[in-house]
């Protein structure tokens, strides 16, 4: 009986010894737990730092954008003041009742070129018709002749550049967005003059008498042919209207 109890106790002791964790293992497990916790803390800290850094960058970007906006606004105000001052200066050069031809010279529009090498240049014309000086001149035309300002402008331009060059100038002026509006109004005044004043009832008459081109060789001309075509449409519309 005693031997049996001794054997049972021995087996139990052996089982406990086998399944119980070793001291070194328990120590390693205890050390591992703080390591996991530390990693969580480190991750949270890093995340906070990243958020703070990102927030700082966003604030810096917003400050830069505000600075750019303020600078642009300031420059825009300065530009408007300078432009306004220049416009006022040019307007002050004109007399209230100054003739349009005289005003053309006063505003130094005659010094601005509209062509080179004997040909009207589209870029030069666009610059001329959209210039501040020309705009002030056209405003003056409205003041002194409210009934037909563009007719008066056409007459003054013809006296300076000649009728054919003015026709070419109007044609190429329609090609630019900056000068198209005034070019269309001058074109209307020009076609009206040709039809009702000069009595050119056909586009062929304009082609020969104004543009000084040979009708038999019409396809050899570029701009002249375009003016011919535009005036032909105007004549057709006018005949249908009246």
Curated annotation (Swiss-Prot):
Induction: Expression is induced during host plant infection. It is found in: Secreted; Host cell membrane. Keywords: Host cell membrane, Host membrane, Membrane, Secreted, Signal, Virulence. Residues 1-24 form the signal peptide. GO terms for cellular component: extracellular region; host cell plasma membrane; membrane. Coiled coil: none annotated. The keyword Metal-binding does not apply. A motif (RxLR-dEER) lies at residues 48-66. Belongs to the RxLR effector family. The RxLR-dEER motif acts to carry the protein into the host cell cytoplasm through binding to cell surface phosphatidylinositol-3-phosphate. Effector that enhances P.infestans colonization of Nicotiana benthamiana leaves. This is RxLR effector protein PexRD15. The gene is PexRD15.
């Amino acid at each position: 009986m005693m031997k049996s109890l001794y054997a049972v106790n021995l087996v139990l002791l052996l089982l406990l010894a086998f399944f119980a964790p070793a001291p070194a293992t328990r120590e390693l497990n205890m050390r591992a737990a703080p390591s996991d916790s530390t990693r969580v803390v480190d991750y949270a800290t890093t995340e906070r730092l990243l958020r703070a850094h990102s927030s700082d960058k966003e604030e810096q970007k917003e400050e830069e954008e505000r600075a750019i906006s303020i600078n642009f606004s300031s420059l825009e105000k300065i530009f408007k003041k300078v432009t306004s001052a220049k416009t006022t200066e040019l307007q002050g050069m004109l007399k209230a009742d100054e003739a349009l031809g005289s005003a053309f010279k006063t505003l130094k529009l005659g010094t601005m070129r509209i062509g080179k090498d004997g040909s009207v240049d589209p870029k030069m014309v666009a610059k001329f018709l959209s210039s501040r000086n020309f705009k002030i001149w056209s405003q003056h035309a409205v003041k002194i002749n409210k009934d037909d300002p563009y007719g008066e402008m056409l007459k003054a331009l013809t006296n300076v550049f000649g009728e054919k060059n003015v026709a070419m100038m109007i044609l190429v002026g329609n090609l630019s967005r900056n000068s198209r509006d005034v070019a269309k109004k001058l074109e209307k005044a020009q076609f009206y003059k040709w039809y009702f004043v000069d009595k050119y009832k056909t586009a062929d008459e304009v082609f020969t008498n104004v543009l000084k081109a040979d009708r038999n060789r019409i396809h050899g001309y570029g701009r002249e042919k375009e003016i011919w075509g535009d005036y032909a449409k105007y004549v057709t519309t006018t005949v249908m209207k009246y």
